[in-house]
Amino acid sequence: MKDDNIENNNIEEENLNIETQVVANEEIALLKAEIKELQDKLIRTTAEIDNTRKRLEKARDEAKDYAIATFAKELLNVSDNLSRALAHKPSNADVEVTNIISGVQMTKDELDKIFHKHHIEEIKPEIGSMFDYNVHNAISHIEHPDHKPNSIITLMQSGYKIRDRLLRPATVQVVKKP
């Protein structure tokens, strides 16, 4: 009987060990699943944070670029006037006038450098290029037998843009259909 009790105790201990092992395995499986779920959440959260950071950087860059748009628009007329002054310089100018013209040229060059630094580009379509309503403003349509319809015949005023944002369209005359 003593042997039977020992054997029963051994069997009970063995069953208890098996049950304990089964419970432990179930807990391990649950913990592994929880770890996997937390790792997935971590990956998604990290990606979300990275996307938010990129979105904020882009918004900051755009705000920086376009914050100067109003100020830049006011400088466009200054640039135009400097260009007009340089286009009408006299060919037989004396030394004083030549020095003034040189100063105007240096001012125009410095303004162009500032525009370039702030990604302000001139829109200066070539004669004969096709009219694009996205960047051109047609002030008149004229007939011209030597040019294609809807092509630019005269550039009245250059346009400007900051990166992909239009500050001012180029003012042009366009050939109309016959």
From Swiss-Prot:
Keywords: Chaperone, Cytoplasm, Stress response
Pfam families xrefs: GrpE
GO molecular function: adenyl-nucleotide exchange factor activity; protein homodimerization activity; protein-folding chaperone binding; unfolded protein binding
Record flagged with keyword Cytoplasm: yes
Coiled-coil residue spans: none
GO terms, biological process: protein folding; protein import into mitochondrial matrix
Compartment(s) where it occurs, according to its Swiss-Prot or TrEMBL record: Cytoplasm
One term under GO cellular component: cytoplasm
Keyword Cell division belongs to the record: no
InterPro entries with a match to the protein in the record: GrpE, GrpE_coiled_coil, GrpE_head
UniProt superkingdom: Bacteria
Function in brief: Participates actively in the response to hyperosmotic and heat shock by preventing the aggregation of stress-denatured proteins, in association with DnaK and GrpE. It is the nucleotide exchange factor for DnaK and may function as a thermosensor. Unfolded proteins bind initially to DnaJ; upon interaction with the DnaJ-bound protein, DnaK hydrolyzes its bound ATP, resulting in the formation of a stable complex. GrpE releases ADP from DnaK; ATP binding to DnaK triggers the release of the substrate protein, thus completing the reaction cycle.
Assembly and oligomerization: Homodimer.
Family the UniProt entry places it in: Belongs to the GrpE family.
Name of the protein in its database record: Protein GrpE
Species the sequence originates in: Rickettsia typhi (strain ATCC VR-144 / Wilmington)
Gene behind this protein: grpE
